[in-house]
């Protein structure tokens, strides 16, 4: 009896020992498999990370922005851009593709052909190399986009709104739902001031970017670029695009640049140089206001026509450069201000390049023009970076004389506008408006620094799901429209790292 019980206990202990050994073996094997898998992932990451083209490049996020440092040859800068921002570029590309094809009623192949046959031959070698580099970087990161896709993405401001109307007129086609679908909308509210108009007599420059929320929510990249040739640049930008494109940038020789779009612009030169190339080149190589103007005029294709607001930190001079296709004009001063809200100032540009109605006070560009003049004049001698931040979030409607966000306020909210804007063809409650803001002054520009704000500069947050439930007419945007958060004003400077 006792022997039998001892045998049972021994058998149980042996069985338990076997279970322990088996469990341990499985655990060790699992750990080895996990380590092997992790090592494989790390090895692949390290293999990509040691690509010579990535030398010196890095990224980090802060204040809602993705800061990207790029340096080297055009091929290196492009590869770094494409590789480090691959997820953001793929995401942004999906939104742009949906927006462009919906608004023009043309398939994406149309834009690919335009990029390949019309734009590419007029892009100089330096920027062709950079665009090829972006494509290579994307492909190396597993994002399958072609060079034609990347070029068309870079031209997402000029192809649908400038080339397509010209193309349709030339080919006597009209596939858009209405003429309004192909009107050039206004983008942005901006100003530049200097001399007795600012607190310290230095240049102050500010800008908020207007676009639809679907695309604009993705406009959250801060580029710090050290090119092989030309000047260092810090600028805000869109994933995959080689220029700022909204625009706000500083170069290391003291040039300060921003702009606002000319409303209802008409014109296109298929033999010209793409605007995204000219604006990048002008910021990279411009040493003065004169240089900037010269580079932008050279090969002007009429794409993304803007009123450029410029500053030269070295001299304290500012300028307004109104660039149409058939006409242009430059104003400059060392004691004054210029504002932009998508209106024209030169009668020749108004006559030859646009059909926008400057006399309708109900329309957004005209109402914002009035508000800009009010704010600047009321604050003469007090304007600084902090005041400029407040200006960019302003909600006073100069037409209704009431405070509240809508499509006529400097901080635009199309989704809060029951009537939209007839001059632009903006429909009621259109999810568009101010999507981010930037400010700098001469002292900050000397340090290659600026402050930037993601989302509405006023701080309000846009929520996509309840908006679409209330306005199902915009459900076509549902695959790509998402919440647009608002982060605090954040300071960035050239050459910084995440811990700075």
Regions found by a protein language model. Name each.
Residues 23-290, 297-303, 309-332, 340, ...:
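N-terminal mature-domain region immediately after signal-peptide cleavage
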